[in-house]
């Protein structure tokens, strides 16, 4: 029988077991629902991996048990056959997986192409240590089939790295970057997503101030319209104080919508808005932000939602705040981009699609209170009321056009139940009903509304501080 044959030929039995082990190892990276456990760390160019691996492992240790497999480069570079690596390291890797939460498998500089390929093949995710002096083509082709995180060493990498690898995230090679990467790997990376709302969006800065002062660590930011401005400011690495100071200077201090013109494409020229985003963000690229960021706009041509994750920060924010009829749209190739609030004023679903952690949502949808009131004008009216009656031809006091446009966004945007989305940790709802949607001078009231709402959320959910 076949069993007798195996017993009589031990070499055949051993060869079959090795072949089966190899087949199992090579099929291992199939997608599963569990958190990634084997993390490949691959050095590109002359970047030394060892000190960074130590920093990543130390950061991961605060979330669980971590093992490191980093054989000497003299050993791995001398290997001539891929099967030799499979046979030599399969048992070591399996044993490390069984006894740890994460295993870092390291391909340092000079480790050899076969070992780099083995690391890429066996990993659930890859961390690539980027040396800008070397092209991304040097990274193993299997890297394009895995979620990739970039650690940027020395100079910031150019966009060709994003073209090649489409990384999930990128981090600077410092303690903050290693901590953020570890939280992503552990599934504890907190995201903050913020709604649009005109001047009411200034409440986001108060929310962020209260959260960060309480010790909440946020790695990812996203939003629409005024939420995009706040998201980009925080992703830029500004602390709450600096972000609020910038908001006072570039938003509250300049009245960005006060450059009205003959309404051919919009009621305003958009020049003040351009200066706002340029003053805030300059020529920074999204790829070079130290924290995760996206903004949302809408393409007037196709009707599609556009999620901005690459390119100019100023361009992404400018598109997201281009209220149709009020601010001129942004022409981008074959796209004509306007305020994302038309389709998704609070893009929580976009943020929640990232499986690396929970999400805090800041929702500004409240009962609409027009800044100038509404209803029948009294029989005896003040000169401004008389002028309004003459211009509108009605005895009804109606909201200004700008407020009507912004409120229409609230009504048209998705009304998805935030509590039904996966990974929503908290919903913060500042009471901004008394703040005019275009009254940017009410920044102090908006900030306080944000702080109060965040304070209430922290009291209800103290576990947000982690």
Describe these PLM feature segments.
Residues 1-17:
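Cyclic-nucleotide recognition modules
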Residues 29-36, 185-186:
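Phosphate-binding P-loop
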Residues 35-62:
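Glycine-rich phosphate-binding P-loop
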Residues 43-45, 65-122, 287, 296, ...:
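P-loop/Walker-type NTP enzyme "switch/lid" segment
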Residues 92-93, 103-174, 365:
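Conserved catalytic-core segment of NTP-binding enzymes
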Residues 146-167, 175-177, 190, 194, ...:
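Non-catalytic peripheral regions of patatin-like phospholipases
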Residues 177-221, 260:
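Helix-rich "cap/lid" substructures immediately adjacent to catalytic or cofactor-binding pockets
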Residues 195, 217-236:
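Catalytic nucleophile loop
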């Amino acid at each position: 029988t076949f069993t007798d044959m195996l017993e009589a030929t031990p070499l055949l039995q051993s060869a079959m077991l090795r072949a089966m082990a190899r087949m199992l190892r090579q099929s291992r990276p199939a997608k599963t629902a569990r958190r990634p456990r084997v993390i490949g760390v691959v050095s590109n160019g002359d970047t030394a991996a060892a000190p960074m691996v130590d920093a990543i492992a130390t950061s991961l240790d605060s979330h669980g048990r971590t093992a490191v497999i980093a054989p000497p480069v003299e050993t791995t570079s001398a290997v001539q056959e891929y099967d030799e690596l499979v046979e030599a390291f399969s048992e070591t890797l399996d044993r490390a997986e069984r006894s740890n939460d994460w295993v870092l498998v390291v391909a340092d500089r000079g480790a050899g192409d076969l070992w780099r390929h083995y690391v890429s093949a066996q990993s659930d995710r890859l961390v690539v240590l980027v040396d800008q002096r070397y092209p991304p083509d040097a990274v193993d082709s299997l890297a394009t089939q895995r979620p990739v995180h970039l650690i940027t060493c020395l100079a910031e990498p150019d966009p060709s790295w994003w073209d090649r690898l489409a990384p999930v995230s990128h981090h600077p090679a410092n303690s903050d970057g290693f901590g953020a990467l570890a939280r992503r790997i552990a599934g504890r990376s907190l995201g903050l997503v913020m709604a649009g709302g005109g001047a009411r969006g200034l409440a986001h800065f108060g929310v962020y101030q209260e959260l960060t002062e309480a010790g909440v660590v946020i790695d990812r930011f996203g939003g629409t319209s005024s939420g995009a401005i706040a998201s980009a400011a925080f992703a830029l690495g500004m602390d709450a104080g600096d972000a609020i100071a910038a908001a006072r200077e570039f938003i509250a201090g300049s009245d960005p919508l006060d450059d009205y013109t003959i309404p051919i494409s919009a009621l305003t020229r958009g020049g003040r808005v351009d200066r706002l985003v340029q003053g805030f963000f300059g020529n920074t690229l999204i790829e070079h932000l130290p924290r995760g960021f996206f903004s949302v706009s809408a393409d007037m041509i196709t009707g599609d939602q556009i999620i901005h994750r690459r390119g100019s920060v100023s361009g992404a924010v400018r598109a997201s705040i281009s209220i149709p009829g009020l601010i001129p749209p942004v022409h981008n190739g074959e796209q004509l981009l306007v305020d994302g609030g038309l389709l998704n004023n609070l893009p929580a679903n976009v943020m929640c699609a990232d499986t690396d952690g929970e999400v805090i949502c800041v929702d500004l949808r409240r009962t609409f209170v027009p800044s100038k009131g509404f209803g029948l004008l009294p029989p005896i009216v003040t000169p401004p009321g008389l002028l309004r009656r003459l211009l509108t031809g009605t005895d009804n006091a109606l909201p200004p056009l700008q407020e009507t446009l912004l409120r229409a966004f609230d009504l048209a945007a998705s009304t998805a139940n935030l509590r039904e989305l996966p990974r929503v940790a908290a919903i913060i709802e500042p009471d901004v009903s008394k703040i005019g949607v275009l009254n940017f001078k009410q920044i102090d009231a908006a900030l306080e509304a944000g702080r109060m709402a965040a304070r209430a959320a922290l009291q209800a959910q103290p576990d947000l501080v982690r």
